[in-house]
């Protein structure tokens, strides 16, 4: 077997005929500037070919159902294994996906609860047991000898009526006695008259026995008779003791509620046998939200407090106004009082209606009449219209005033009451999955099973323990299994898939990972690296596209790709061990690793402009009533270990809260008391890593508005004027402008069924969407348009953020998250600054080489120099050391986090003993 992977002549994207040898069964890091060609070599060449060869070994029938990779543009690759890629793009956004389902731990939990779970009555909470006749007989025979017992068949349990037919029926079956409401009656002699409106209990006396050896046969017959008469129930009355009730079904003898036999599907929120019927297993329901109906409670009703009422409904001749007039007379309020100052009762009536009919005086066409009208309230009105309408437009309009709320029936647990009434170790499956992963492992280890249950559950428990341990090892101990997969960051989702792969214990596989350290604090890096080594030691080859210094120092082999980005990259600058990279003169990475180059500390830390934005009483997720101050006019970093509450504080509370206050957005922020100081800013901009567009038609030129100016420019040319072309003629989205043969895509897709689809340039337009301009890189276009200031300024900002290598027409679907974020940053930089803007960024260093981080720091400093405020969630210490102010959260992740450990300059944080960030930051200052 070859001990090397040999790549010859790779020309994918910007790779310049790259040939490379890398050792097998080692941990290999691919590094280099953003856009240098790392992903093109790792994912689009090596992974694509490994995956393609594996899929080609399957039958043509099977290949139709599998995603077929394109054959990469490479002469040959030798020594390949089947390849598995773990990137950040494939996080499931399905609201039904949770951490538990993605890792498959939930499947094992369903099996555990179905096999050793203890069912309880969903109504009264009593334990429900299912027993055979033999088990019931054995329990009775354990009573002290000579015990006097009565076998009763409980036919009526707590039901009103005279029950004459029931008593007649007992008599017909040959039974002489019955116990009615605790009293024994002789059915042949006593005249029994029961009161109709009182609940009664009626039990037929099947047998009276003294417990002794040799009565088993008689006892079995009596119990079987009782079970038949009472539909699976038997009551044993022991003289001098409480009655014992036995059931041969899973049914509560007291409430009469029966549950199905326990099966794994009963615990699945995706199965009709397990999911809550009210919310369909989602755990949340879309409900009309009062905060969206009345977004600004400082306004009066006349001033537009109720956003669903337009101006026309406030005119005095309108029906709504006449109804309000009747309400004003009844409750004594006026339409000019701010909504928040109206009495609670009035607010309630306006939203949920008036139970009593109102006398409404209404004039139309000079005819005045008095109507008896019941006012249903705005929320009830919207809810009714939403339920009744068949119009998608109307539904979409009303949905603007709806938000996701926990389902009132299952309280967010997603399952039926019967499934939630089953416990293992005293916890139901939802309570178990809601704990942090580290607590789940402790809980599983602490359960005391009976000998029988121990044998049944041992294999299942082993699988659950190993999978939970892997998640803890990749630094995800703070997550819970009930967490929705769509709410995970790219790094978290990737590490979850990494843990799943370790759990599979495969060997001889080629794993290709894309920056697994994203979102991970330095403290947890060691655990991630040891996990990667564990995967290598089993006998796998790992290629990791990574910029993290610790990972590079621990790697067996490093490949540095460059020297620049885009057209200036695509070559192997250096490859070898850490020492070989550090001693290579051409390697930019080597210079940063030796310290010859570094991100410089700022000359001084800004104090800010004296104003602050303060979040008070933040309590969302794991935040423990936090009050955080953010100085305006500074570069502020929010730091802390993974899961400490950074994203919750900044994205869920600060951004959404300010967005609602300043921009009147409909975002629903997390729980907090108040935000102060917002009057000092006029814009809030969140620059995240979501795609700038989801179709090949969107690109950096359309997003930044450069394309509009270019089209305008084309329409000003002499030839265009002669032909009467307007800017729209140069759009690839508009008929008349676009090529109709390919609908403006520039390429035509030919489906090949079990082979991968082929894309060919359109023969009519030769793939030129608008001349050759869109095919230029930003760098080339900047030179081409240098005399046109409006275009030049926009392109210059793209250059400044390090995106000179991307083509203007490069589809947004081909851009990485980091590139999309920097295009947004460039777009913001190209706007005229007001000096009062708040920018929020979540890990902007994702996908960035240390050299790119250096460039990014300068751009952010430029924004702050213009008087703006930048708040960044960050783990990268080269970035953190350049901050003016730091808010450090912790001390741990999950329940053990959610408090502010320290605030102040990087130097102050480094001196704080409790701060993990400070501990690692020290050596960077």
Give names to the regions the model predicted.
Residues 1-925:
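Conserved phosphate-binding elements of NTP-dependent enzyme cores
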């Amino acid at each position: 077997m070859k001990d090397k992977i040999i790549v010859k002549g790779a020309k994918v994207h910007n790779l310049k005929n790259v040939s490379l040898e890398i050792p097998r069964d080692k941990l290999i890091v691919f590094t280099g500037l953003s856009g240098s060609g790392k992903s093109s070599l790792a994912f689009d060449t090596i992974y694509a070919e490994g995956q393609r060869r594996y899929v080609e070994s399957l039958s043509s029938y099977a290949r139709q159902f599998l995603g077929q990779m394109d054959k990469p543009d490479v002469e040959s690759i030798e020594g390949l294994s089947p390849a598995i890629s773990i990137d950040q793009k494939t996080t499931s956004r399905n609201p039904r996906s949770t951490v538990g389902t993605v890792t498959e731990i939930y499947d094992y939990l369903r099996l555990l609860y179905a096999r050793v779970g203890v069912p309880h009555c969903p109504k009264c909470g009593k334990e429900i047991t299912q027993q055979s006749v033999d088990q019931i007989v054995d329990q009775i025979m354990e009573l002290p000898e000579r015990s006097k017992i009565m076998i009763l068949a409980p036919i009526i349990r707590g039901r009103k009526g005279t029950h004459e037919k029931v008593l007649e029926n007992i008599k017909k079956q040959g039974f002489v006695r019955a116990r009615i409401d605790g009293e024994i009656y002789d059915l042949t002699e006593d005249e029994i008259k029961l009161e109709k409106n009182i609940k009664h209990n009626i039990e037929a006396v099947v047998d009276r026995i003294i417990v002794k050896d040799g009565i088993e046969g008689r006892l079995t017959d009596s119990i079987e008779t009782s079970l038949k008469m009472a539909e699976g129930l038997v009551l044993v009355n022991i003289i001098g003791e409480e009655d014992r009730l036995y059931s041969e079904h899973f049914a509560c003898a007291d409430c009469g509620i029966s549950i199905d036999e326990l099966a794994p599907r009963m615990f699945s929120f995706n199965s009709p046998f397990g999911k809550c019927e009210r919310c369909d297993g989602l755990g949340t329901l879309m409900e009309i939200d009062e905060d969206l109906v009345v977004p600004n409670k400082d306004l009066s009703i006349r001033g537009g407090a109720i956003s669903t009422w337009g101006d026309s409904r406030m005119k005095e001749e309108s029906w709504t106004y006449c109804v309000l007039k009747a309400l004003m007379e009844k409750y004594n309020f006026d339409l000019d009082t701010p909504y928040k100052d109206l009495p609670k009762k009035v607010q309630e009536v306006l939203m949920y209606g008036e139970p009593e009919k109102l006398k409404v005086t209404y004039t139309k066409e000079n005819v005045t009449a008095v109507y008896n009208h019941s006012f249903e309230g705005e929320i009830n009105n919207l809810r009714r219209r939403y339920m009744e309408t068949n119009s998608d437009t109307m539904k979409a309009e009303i949905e603007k005033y709806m938000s996701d709320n926990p389902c009132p029936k299952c309280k967010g647990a997603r399952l039926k009451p019967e499934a939630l009434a089953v416990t293992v170790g005293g916890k139901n499956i939802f309570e178990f999955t809601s704990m942090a992963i580290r607590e789940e492992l402790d809980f599983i280890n602490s359960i005391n099973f009976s000998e029988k249950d121990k044998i049944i559950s041992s294999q299942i428990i082993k699988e659950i323990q190993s999978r939970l341990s892997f998640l803890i090892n990749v630094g995800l101990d703070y997550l819970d299994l009930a967490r929705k997969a769509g709410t995970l960051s790219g790094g978290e989702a990737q590490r979850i898939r990494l843990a799943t792969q370790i759990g599979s214990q495969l060997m001889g596989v080629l794993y290709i990972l894309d920056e697994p350290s994203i979102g991970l604090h330095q403290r947890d890096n060691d655990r991630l690296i040891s996990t990667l080594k564990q995967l290598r030691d089993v006998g796998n080859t790992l290629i990791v596209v990574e910029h993290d210094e610790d990972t590079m120092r621990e790697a067996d082999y490093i490949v540095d790709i460059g020297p620049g980005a885009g057209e200036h990259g695509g070559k192997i600058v250096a490859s070898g061990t850490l020492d070989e990279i550090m001693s290579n003169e051409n390697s930019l990475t080597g210079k940063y690793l030796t310290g010859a180059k570094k991100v410089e500390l700022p000359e001084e830390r800004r104090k800010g402009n004296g104003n602050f934005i303060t979040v008070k009483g933040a309590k969302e997720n794991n935040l423990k009533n936090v009050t955080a101050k953010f100085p305006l006019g500074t570069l502020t970093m929010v730091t802390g270990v993974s899961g400490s509450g950074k994203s919750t504080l900044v994205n869920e509370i600060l951004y959404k809260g300010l967005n609602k206050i300043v921009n009147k957005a409909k975002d629903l922020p997390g729980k907090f008391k108040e935000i102060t100081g917002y009057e000092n800013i006029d814009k809030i901009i969140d620059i995240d890593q979501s795609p700038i567009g989801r179709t090949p038609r969107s690109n950096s030129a359309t997003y930044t508005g450069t394309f509009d100016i270019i089209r305008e420019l084309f329409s000003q040319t002499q030839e265009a004027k002669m032909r009467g072309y307007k800017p729209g003629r140069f759009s690839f989205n508009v008929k008349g402008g676009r090529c109709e043969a390919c609908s403006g895509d520039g390429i035509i897709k030919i489906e090949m069924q079990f082979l991968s689809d082929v894309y060919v340039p359109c023969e009519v337009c030769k793939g030129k969407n608008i001349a050759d301009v869109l095919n230029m890189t930003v760098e080339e276009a900047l030179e081409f348009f240098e005399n046109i200031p409006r275009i030049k300024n926009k392109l210059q900002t793209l250059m400044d953020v390090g995106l000179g290598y991307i083509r203007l027409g490069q589809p947004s679907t081909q851009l990485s998250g980091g590139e999309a974020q920097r295009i947004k940053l460039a777009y913001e930089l190209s706007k005229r600054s007001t000096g009062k803007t708040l920018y929020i960024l979540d890990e902007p260093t994702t996908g960035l080489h240390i050299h790119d981080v250096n460039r990014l720091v300068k751009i952010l400093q430029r924004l702050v120099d213009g008087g703006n405020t930048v708040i960044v969630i960050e783990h990268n210490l080269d970035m953190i050391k350049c901050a003016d102010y730091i808010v450090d959260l912790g001390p741990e992740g999950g329940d053990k986090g959610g408090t502010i450990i320290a605030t102040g300059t990087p130097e102050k944080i480094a001196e704080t003993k409790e701060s993990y960030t400070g501990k690692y930051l020290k050596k960077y200052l």
